């Protein structure tokens, strides 16, 4: 290897030679740039430099993801082999009520179908953008979505999703998908962030409640868990690779859940349970 080779040259060469998905390649480049080594010479890299760069990242989830990037891209150099991959911190949300979420989503005439796909099918935003009427499968009286494609964040690549699978959806949502016209189908060059930006605009109006596609996917999982849907069904609906992911990342606990868990004395009022929502009505 040329002693004067720059990190950007080395990284792009490594990334192009490996079988990474398009979005993974984009994320890896972004991660390396984020720690300020992109224009440095490879010869100047050291384990201590990586440790200091990563240790300065305040967000633990970001630090974890960039550590994974560095260990992967610079694996052959051996300078990142001792970096520890820290545990991530699950995202938590103060979830609005179902009615409030519907009220917000319905304000978006252009993107409401995509947001409902996140909320009632647990899709990631790139997966929701890739859905077309051909994605709907009817088996008996049940409707399913085939999840086998996803748009990249920049809208330049339609590739395979993080996890391929089938998700059962309510009939009303299947009807909405079947009504998607050719003009409404997501086009190349449209960044999926358009939906996230639309969510920001929705949040600026009315109740000042902030929503985003990941929150809606989170609601989908949390709602099933709170309705005591068997965990293996939640795992399949979320298309997780194992049950640990389902329980660790998406089982959100609030103070109210602790209150419900407290034993009561005979003179105490029973703690009222939340309304049970039937997802498939």
What role is predicted for each listed range?
Residues 136-140, 229-249:
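Short, polar N-cap/turn motifs at the start of nucleic acid-interacting alpha helices
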Residues 160-166, 171, 264-281:
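C-terminal secondary-structure termini that scaffold catalytic or DNA-interacting sites
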Residues 170-208, 220:
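Active-site/catalytic core of tyrosine-dependent DNA strand-transfer enzymes
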Residues 98, 131-176:
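Conserved tyrosine-mediated DNA breakage-rejoining catalytic core shared by Y-recombinases
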Residues 60, 64, 83-125, 129:
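Basic, Lys/Arg- and aromatic-enriched nucleic-acid-binding interface segment
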Residues 2-31, 54-61:
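Short, aromatic/basic-rich helix-turn unit that serves as a nucleic-acid recognition element
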Residues 31-85, 122-126:
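N-terminal DNA-binding recognition helix of tyrosine site-specific recombinases/integrases
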Residues 20, 95, 238-263:
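Catalytic-site neighborhood detector that most strongly recognizes the C-terminal catalytic loop/helix
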């Amino acid at each position: 290897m040329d002693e004067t080779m720059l990190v950007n040259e080395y990284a792009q060469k490594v990334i192009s030679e490996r079988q990474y998905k398009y979005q993974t390649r984009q994320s890896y480049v972004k991660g390396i740039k984020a720690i300020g080594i992109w224009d440095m010479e490879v010869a100047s890299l050291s384990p201590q430099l990586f440790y200091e760069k990563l240790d300065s990242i305040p967000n633990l989830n970001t630090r974890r993801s960039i550590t994974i990037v560095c260990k992967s891209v610079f694996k052959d150099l051996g300078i990142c082999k001792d970096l520890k991959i820290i545990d991530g911190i699950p995202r938590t949300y103060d979830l609005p009520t179902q009615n409030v979420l519907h009220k917000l989503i319905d304000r978006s005439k252009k993107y409401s179908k995509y947001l409902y796909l996140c909320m009632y099918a647990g899709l990631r935003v790139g997966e929701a953008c890739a859905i077309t009427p051909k994605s709907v499968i009817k088996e008996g009286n049940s409707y399913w979505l085939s999840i086998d494609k996803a748009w990249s964040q920049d809208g330049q690549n339609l590739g395979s999703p993080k996890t391929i699978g089938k998700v059962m959806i309510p009939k009303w949502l299947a009807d909405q998908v079947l009504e998607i016209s050719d003009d409404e189908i997501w086009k190349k060059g449209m960044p999926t962030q358009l939906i996230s930006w639309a969510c920001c605009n929705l949040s600026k109006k009315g109740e000042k409640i902030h929503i985003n596609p990941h929150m809606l996917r989170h609601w989908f999982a949390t709602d099933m868990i709170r309705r005591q849907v068997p965990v293996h069904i939640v795992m399949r609906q979320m298309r997780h690779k194992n049950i640990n992911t389902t329980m660790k990342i998406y089982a959100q606990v609030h103070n109210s859940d602790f209150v419900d868990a407290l034993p009561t004395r005979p003179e105490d009022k029973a703690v009222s349970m939340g309304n049970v929502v039937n997802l498939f009505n």
